[in-house]
UniProtKB/Swiss-Prot annotation:
Protein name from the UniProt record: Translation initiation factor IF-2
Family annotation (InterPro entries): EF-G-like_DII (IPR053905), IF2_II (IPR044145), IF2_N (IPR006847), P-loop_NTPase (IPR027417), Small_GTP-bd (IPR005225), T_Tr_GTP-bd_dom (IPR000795), TF_IF2_bacterial-like (IPR000178), TIF_IF2 (IPR015760)
Domain of life of the native organism: Bacteria
Keyword Ligase in annotation: no
Length: 1003
């Protein structure tokens, strides 16, 4: 396969300068650096078409004589397909040409004679005809033409000649522009109808590239002897007829190829010829690079005498079974029909017709022919060529960094992905992305988690659409990779069975939610809760009689304090029906509104329980009116929301409330699930029990959970070792809507994490590990503050940071406490950093971490275990214990405010006027002043004004004297002398004395 054409080669072919061609390529949108750059074939074709008009005119003028002259001497045309070659072999083959025989080297005449016949017949029509005029013009041309005819009939009398003539005729119809000038020393370009041979030889790319090699030698007659004994004008460095010996052996008498071409035709490099007079070396000359004198003797008389360019490899169809010679210097394979032995650098490759193709040379790489070395068997596909061509287009450069062009492609990245992840997606270098982002003003390392905005910014610069995958979508894709799905019942309608409703009790703090559940369960839970408020989700399943039918209902009790927003939202998502408890004596409160919004967001029907109607100040009608503003219109007002007036304390109308819940479940909801599938559920709460380990409160939503199942819950996994119901009794299996406490996980899952039964522990571990890694990346991206070059100085300044370690009795409480603390609004000079969080007692590990990071441990409903207390005392670690969440929030907020830098304000304490100035060699200028009001103190800060303009700020009173005695302060109405730190003073200057006083911060 020929090499790619270079810019300067194409410019010579088109007859223009390289500079003009570079300018045209740039106008056409092609990215080419210099004149030595290679050009893809499609671009070459476009340039040839662009300059086609001028090129065609030149070729026509040269083609007309070439076509006209061969028409008359028909025998010459047939004999001159290889102008010089047929004539010379004809001499030994036909006796009428003794001169040719004498001119040929001794002993070499018989071989070329035989070889010449297939060569003459094998000459392709297009290249052959242009050569005919060059042979016909000289007076001696007709004789060798006549002698050439018997030479054609050597291998196959008659037939070969007949086939050779039709093969030559097409050459006349498609004349070669330079065929005529060959004897006159003019250029010998390739046939105009063909594309130029593309190779590394800069002298062989155009039709006009071969003029100089045949200067002053004059036209070589078609029948003239080959310069075996006489000098050849242009081939001084070439022995014999190596090239033409191979060319003559192209086809045998039957038109088949005899020997492979020495160079481009077979894919291997051609031996270089000797130095040519005009600098144009014949690529296939017989100089002894890969061959020896044998090559010259093997085909001495086959040097072609015409000026035509030999055909390019593309024009010569390969003959089956003839492969390129592999060893350097060995002859090619012989022809198929009889004839002389194949000519090459060594012995001929066969006894058949045409000359055998010369062996591969030792490999002259570079400008003369194809590259040296082993032949390249593979060819680039169209896709590879297209990719290379596209890569040559103007690249995407950001700040000197070359980056790929996305061309609008969409890249999906997980939240918290790093630049290394981005680079893997687009096949780029992560270091290049880091440098590009630095040039855009962002400082990020390759492995650090990057915010969504930064990823999208970088993607836009590279023409990529970065799509940050939401955690839900990412988790769904993760499960799909394991052929798992969450949230859908398996099987058909026949597999579904009715399940109990899950009811969440929501409302404002102290409105009676837990007391209502106590009344329903006939238990007393609220009395055991700290501060009388619920600080976690409790799950209970009770059996109640509704209209003489026993029904099972699962209740979830959510906290009402504002810090437990996430718990209420989680409870709403895990439920079928929401019971909104509103105190009749208190009305609609902020958490009431929030609970309404959570229920509406989860598309959950609401039943309103107006509690505390037994109090004298209760006003149920007022509650109905207030809730109407939030879209909860009572049925008696024409709406669809059920309102029930109850008293949880007295137990009034509780049965009516339960009946309303069951009615809503039956009328509005189709509560069914498949109990036979693998269990799926949600962990509504989790905590670390000292004796039992991690314990998760789970509600099974579909399927049946059994002891021994392999489960994954969030980023934790394990096997169900034990299940306990709300009464502490062991259960072996839990069906849909059943709340149970599960033991056996390797850690404490997050509240609200999905629980899924998988095939084995291995799958569970893989899912949990991937979720854990994703969680860490997302947390790191969220907590990392973006640092740009503009705010680098402010970031490097010292800030006051309060480090906290949070420990709680369950995951929900820790989550609520963390979110509440992070919502505290503080100035930028004070930062809150939660370095660790966990469920369970305070351990020695927590104390060690706190001591190393100077952190405070917040223990919520837990105590220190073992020697943790002793270590905390020894290390000076502050451990704070709380049982009510809002007290922890208040103290942390106070601590943050105490860390703020004090605020100072200026307070004026006196004024003085300079009445006289004295000079003292030891101290300089002394100002004699009169204190007008207030006091003047030594070392106080002063402001000096002159004619109403401040001339000195923050000057100091270095020395103060009253009469001749040193004084600490001087009161109004007295004279004094003072030495100021500001020397440029004059009479009548005003001195204002002030001090900076710390003022308390506003709460």
């Amino acid at each position: 396969m020929p090499g790619k054409l270079r810019v300067h080669e194409l410019a010579k072919q088109l007859g223009i300068t390289s500079k003009e061609l570079l300018a045209t390529l740039k106008d056409k949108g092609e990215f080419v650096k210099t004149a030595s750059s290679t050009i893809e074939p499609p671009v070459v074709k476009r340039m040839q078409e662009h300059y086609g008009s001028s090129g065609s005119d030149k070729s026509d003028t040269a083609a007309k004589p070439a076509a006209a002259k061969p028409a008359a001497p028909k025998p010459a045309a047939s004999a001159a397909p290889k102008p010089g070659a047929p004539a010379k072999p004809a001499a030994p083959a036909a006796k009428p040409a003794p001169a040719a025989a004498s001119a040929a080297k001794p002993g070499a005449a018989p071989k070329p004679g035989v070889q010449a016949k297939p060569a003459a017949a094998a000459k392709p029509g297009a290249p052959a005809k242009p050569a005919a005029p060059s042979a016909a013009k000289p007076g001696s041309a007709p004789k060798p033409a006549a002698a050439a005819k018997p030479a054609f009939s050597g291998p196959t009398p008659g037939d070969a000649a007949k086939k050779a003539e039709p093969a030559a005729k097409p050459g006349a119809e498609a004349p070669r522009p330079d065929g005529m000038p060959r004897p006159m020393g003019k250029p010998a370009p390739k046939p105009g109808a063909r594309a130029p041979r593309v190779a590394n030889n800069p002298f062989s790319t155009g039709g006009g590239e071969r003029p100089a090699p045949r200067p002053g030698g004059g036209p070589r007659p078609g029948g003239g002897p080959r310069p075996g004994g006489g000098p050849r004008p242009q081939g001084q460095g070439r022995p014999g007829g190596q090239r033409d010996g191979q060319r003559d052996g192209q086809r045998d008498g039957q038109g088949n190829r005899g020997g492979q071409r020495q160079g481009a035709g077979a894919g291997g490099p051609r031996p270089q010829g000797g130095p040519r007079p005009q600098g144009g070396s014949r690529p296939q000359g017989g100089s002894a690079q890969g061959g020896s004198a044998k090559g010259a003797q093997g085909a001495p008389s086959q040097e072609r005498q015409g000026g035509g360019r030999r055909p390019s490899p593309a024009m010569m169809p390969p003959t089956p079974g003839q492969m390129p010679a592999k060893a350097p210097g060995k002859g090619g394979r012989g022809g198929q029909a009889g004839g002389g032995a194949g000519g090459g650098f060594n012995r001929g490759g066969g006894t058949g017709g045409g000359a055998g193709r010369g062996g591969r040379r030792g490999g002259t790489a570079g400008a003369f022919g194809r590259p040296g070395g082993a032949p390249r068997r593979g060819r680039k596909s169209k896709r590879q060529k297209r990719n290379e061509y596209e890569s040559m287009q103007a690249p995407n450069v950001i700040g000197g960094v070359r980056l790929p062009d996305g061309k609008g492609a969409t890249i999906r990245l997980a939240r918290g992905a790093s630049l290394a992840d981005f680079a893997d997606k687009i096949g780029a270098d992560a270091a290049a992305l880091v440098q590009a982002l630095f040039n855009l003003g962002e400082m990020v390392t390759a492995t650090a988690s990057v915010s969504d905005e930064t990823l999208q910014l970088l993607g836009e610069e590279m023409n990529y659409k970065v799509q940050v995958v939401s955690p839900e979508d990412e988790d769904r894709e993760l499960l799909e990779s394991f052929d798992l799905q969450f949230g859908e019942d398996e099987g058909g309608e026949a597999d579904l069975a009715k399940r109990p409703p899950v009811v969440t009790v929501m409302g404002h703090v102290d409105h009676g939610k837990t007391r209502l559940l106590d009344t329903i369960r006939k238990a007393n839970v609220g009395s055991d809760e700290a501060g009388g408020i619920t600080q976690g989700i409790g799950a209970y399943q009770v059996k109640v009689n509704v209209e003489d039918t026993e029904r099972t209902i699962t209740f979830l009790d959510t906290p009402g304090h504002e810090a437990f927003t996430a718990m209420r939202a989680r409870g709403a998502k895990s439920t079928d029906i929401a019971v909104l408890v509103v105190a009749a004596d208190d009305g609609v409160m902020p958490q009431t509104v929030e609970a309404i919004n959570h229920a509406k967001a989860a598309d959950v029907p609401i039943v309103v329980a107006v509690n505390k109607i037994d109090k004298p100040e209760a006003s149920p009608e007022k509650i109905r009116g207030q809730l109407t503003e939030y879209g909860l219109i009572p049925e008696e007002y024409g709406g669809d929301t059920i309102f029930v007036d109850i008293s949880a304390k007295q137990g009034l109308n509780i049965d009516e409330l339960l009946a309303s819940v069951c009615l809503t479940a039956d009328a509005e909801l189709d509560l069914v699930a498949n109990p036979e599938m693998d269990a799926q559920g949600v962990a509504i709460e989790a905590h670390l029990d000292r004796g039992r380990g991690p314990v998760a409160t789970v509600i099974v939503q579909r399927g049946t959970l059994r002891v021994g199942d392999s489960i994954v819950a969030g980023d934790t996994y394990g096997r169900v070792r034990r299940m306990v119901d709300e009464y502490g009794r062991d259960v072996e299996e839990a069906g849909p809507s059943r709340p149970v406490q599960v033991q056996g996980l390797n850690g404490v899952p997050g509240a609200g994490d999905n629980l899924l039964v998988v095939e084995d522990d291995r799958i569970a571990r893989q899912i949990a590990n991937q979720r854990n890694a994703r969680k860490r990346n997302a947390l790191a991206a969220r907590s990392r503050k973006r640092v740009s070059l503009e705010d680098l100085d402010s970031v490097l300044k010292e800030h006051s940071t309060l480090n906290l370690i949070l420990k709680g009795d369950n995951a929900g409480s820790v989550e609520a406490l963390e979110e509440a603390l992070l919502k505290i609004e503080m100035d930028d000079e004070v930062q809150l950093n939660i370095i660790d969080r966990g469920v369970g007692a305070v351990t020695q590990t927590n104390v060690t971490l706190a001591a190393a990071s100077d952190a405070v441990i917040i223990a919520f409903n837990v105590r220190a275990e073992g020697k943790a207390t002793e270590e905390a005392n020894a290390e000076g670690v502050d451990v704070r214990y709380y049982t009510i969440i809002y007290r922890a929030i208040e103290e942390v907020e106070a601590a943050l405010k105490g860390m703020l830098k004090p605020i100072y304000e200026e307070r004026v304490i006196g004024h003085a006027e300079i009445r006289a100035i004295f000079k003292a060699s030891s101290v300089g200028l002394i100002a004699g002043c009169m204190v007008e009001d207030g006091k003047v103190r030594r070392n106080a800060t002063v402001r000096i004004t002159r004619d109403g303009n401040v001339i000195a700020e923050n000057a100091k009173i270095v020395s103060l004297r009253r009469e001749k005695d040193d004084a600490t302060e001087v009161s109004a109405g007295y004279e004094c002398g003072m030495v100021l730190s500001y020397p440029d003073i004059s009479v009548d200057d005003k001195i204002e004395v002030y001090e900076m006083v710390e003022v308390p911060r506003e709460a």
